[in-house]
Every structure is written in C-alpha cells, then in structure tokens.
Amino acid sequence: MKFDGVILYGPPASGKDTVTAELCKLSSAYAYFEKLKAGEGRTTGYRMVTEESLADLRQRGLIVHEVARYGATYAVDSLGLNKLFEQGRIPIVHMGQVAGVEFLRRHNARWLDVLLWCSKDVTEKRARQRGSSDVKERLAVWDATLADLGTLAEPQFTMSIRTDVLGPSTVAVLIHSAMARK
C-alpha cells in the first residue's frame, strides 16, 4: 500500500519532533503539519489562532480533531492538510490520542500510522533535558497515553517503534522505507 501521510503517535518526549526532523532530512517531500493552537504556551511549530477563529472553523466542519491540553486547544484542520496534499507534500501529523488517529484516518488519505514509544523514565529525562517547565504534567500525559492504548480492542498501528532503543535517524529510515513500499 502506498501512503499519503504519516501519523506519529506517542507520549510526550517519545521523539515525534526529532523523528520528524530526520524524515525531512531524508526527503523534501515530507512536511511537518503545524496544528492550529489557541491558548498559552509554546508557539513554535503551531499556527496560532484565536478561540473565535477555532470556533468558526469548527462550525464550518473544518476541524478533523481537536484536544485541550497544557492550557491550550490544539486542532488538526482539513484546510491545512489539504493544502499540503495539493502541494504534493507528505504531511507528518503528531498525535497524542488514539481518537485523533482514528479521526485522521477518516480524512481522505492513506496514513502510515506509527506508534513511537519510550519508557516513562526516558520521557522524564528527555523532558528535563529540553527544559520543560511542566514535567509532572507531561508524565501524567504519559500515563494517559498508556491508558489510551489500553482502550484498543486490537493493535491499531502499522508500525510500533521503541525510540529508547533505536536512534531517531534509524527510526526515520524505517518509516521512510515503509512509505516507499507500493
């Protein structure tokens, strides 16, 4: 099967950003999908919008999935995804909830869904190394991600990769190889 996009699912600090950067080094066709974000916190890597703009998109049926976390609302919008597809790009979408993966699968594309996983200890270490000020909250989200996976009746991911065992460049090569298969 040929895939149109990549979903990277996993707990905080499981390597989604690092693996995305490595994929983009492998091919200029890959493009990190910047989610819409309304609220406080980090702005890099997001398309910042107001709550009113988000409500308008929601009302018009243009939000594929959204979640409230870390004092903000994050959303995947069909306009942003379609723009990347129209440009011939391969979107890489980061997800932290199984429901988001399922909603994205319903969008008009074939997705390579990848579970990136690392231990809770590694999540804590990585979060501290990158200077996260909300490490306790991120560890709680790690627990929530594990619980979220426990709700699945059967495995849902095409690939599952331990990022505390394999380095980011190796992980990217594995994903890129799967994308290249027809």
Over which residues does each language-model region extend?
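Hydrophobic anchor at the beta1->P-loop junction of P-loop NTPases
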Residues: 8
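P-loop (Walker A) phosphate-binding loop of NTP-binding proteins
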Residues: 11
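Walker A/P-loop
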Residues: 16-17
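Post-Walker A helix-loop "phosphate-sensing" segment adjacent to the P-loop in P-loop NTPases
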Residues: 25-34
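ATP-dependent small-molecule kinase phosphotransfer cores
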Residues: 37-91, 96-97
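Conserved phosphate-donor/acceptor-positioning beta-strand/loop module used by diverse small-molecule
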Residues: 92-96, 106-128
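Small-molecule kinase domains that catalyze NTP-dependent phosphoryl transfer to phosphate-bearing small molecules
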Residues: 101, 129-174, 178-181
